[in-house]
Amino acid sequence: MAVDTYTYTSKIESILDKQSSLFQLSTTQLYNKILENNEGELTELGAINAKTGKYTGRSPKDKFIVTEPSYRDDIDWGNINQPIEEEKFLNLYDKVLNYLDKKDELYVFNGYAGSDEDSQLKLTVVNELAWHNLFAQNMFIRPSTNEEAQEIKPNFTIISAPHFKADPSIDGTNSETFIITSFKHKVILIGGTEYAGEMKKGIFSVINYLLPKDDIMSMHCSANVGEKGDVALFFGLSGTGKTTLSADPTRKLIGDDEHGWNNNGIFNIEGGCYAKAINLSQKKEPQIYDAIKYGTILENVVVDEEGDVDFDDNQYTENTRAAYPIHHIDNIVTPSKAAHPNTIIFLTADAFGVLPPISKLTKDQAMYHFLSGFTAKLAGTERGVTEPEPSFSTCFGSPFLPLNAKVYADLLGNLIDKHGVDVYLVNTGWTGGKYGVGRRISLNYTRQMVNQAITGKLRDAEYVKDDMFGLDIPVEVEDVPQTLLNPINAWSKPEAYRTQAQDLINRFKSNFEKFGEDVDELAVNGGFE
């Protein structure tokens, strides 16, 4: 790792040395503390449910990176990576430590991010709340023993004080809430929000800064491996089917959200899963449902007086969650790492109905679509009219990328070349017309296409190039209707298809302009210029 040492300030050392700083508590001990402190409620599934108050999701406007000379020029500053001066940070840091020093109890966890020891970040997590500490134990990688935990000298520390509130006029924040990362001081400082996902995504952002510095790819994707050791990566924004398609009973899960790719292969950054729980059912998503048991943290789920859970109720938020250790899932790789990928799948739910259900990408096209990170969401209007709305998230994870996007795209391109990876763009959205006119592509057909891709059956298939997007479409895929494969054939009026396709192409081009002249060549070779 680029950063491998960290010296605690004397203030942190004194806090951690106090008897009231409870180190590496077991799940049962943390359950007892959570219930004793009225931080959560026990459910009939055995999981703890905690409410996060007014923040039921991430707070991107309150996320900062400290501007320090050693790395100031590396960061892609803007609305996502907002700067805060080091002096402001240190003053706030000091106030938070003084606040925590007065607490009756704190909860401390030592663990890791990264299941490959060659690319591992050692962590200390200091929590004001016991349920946050159990969340950290679930999401990060636990040491095998307490003795191992005590030996950890952290590269990075999370200090979480959700009940401490900043004063924006003094502290330089935008509100009472703050998530501040200092690469110099190796700290993520969190206050004013009880949403536990800030810890998970805070470390992911740190990883996305550190790993590329060592020419290691960090990725917002899921990954699985087949019986023959063939590895597949799945990239996709919310609603594209990433969780559903990567949860394959014939393949073992490496991880569901965050991965690294180094000289050894693919490795999970996390030790757990943070699954969406809204409308969860055992029938639809048995793997996730069955993982919700003793040791799991539920967030903002509706629970009645008898402890019965209603996953369909969005009373508190649509963003209900379940955080559980990955060993709650049966069909996993242990440890969570595997060889270099054979196949990469980019998932998009195209509500315009013009992208092919599956197409094979060249390296340049893969880099272009990786930078674009396209899907389409459905925006309701006051009059009840719904129109597709394009959504572009750079590298399928723009909120968590501290470096310039081209750094990640270049790394991906080099790895595709080096390991001969097949890359496919899979549309899980509409065909035969846009949303409201066309129809959703059958999940069974999508599964069949993905299965053919990741087992290598499409590698040497016959392809035809579509004349709008320049994408290579397979002439046939076993058990998938041929008329479905080329989208123009699914539309009743070819000219209407071309008009809609050109509209989407224009949106891609407009979005790509934000990357500037550095990617002009890529726009020509991989895009629609």
Swiss-Prot record:
It catalyses: oxaloacetate + ATP = phosphoenolpyruvate + ADP + CO2. It is an enzyme of class 4 (lyase). CDD domains: PEPCK_ATP. Its EC number is 4.1.1.49. GO terms for molecular function: ATP binding; metal ion binding; phosphoenolpyruvate carboxykinase (ATP) activity. Pfam families: PEPCK_ATP. Pathway: Carbohydrate biosynthesis; gluconeogenesis. Belongs to the phosphoenolpyruvate carboxykinase (ATP) family. This is Phosphoenolpyruvate carboxykinase (ATP). It comes from Staphylococcus saprophyticus subsp. saprophyticus (strain ATCC 15305 / DSM 20229 / NCIMB 8711 / NCTC 7292 / S-41). The gene is pckA.
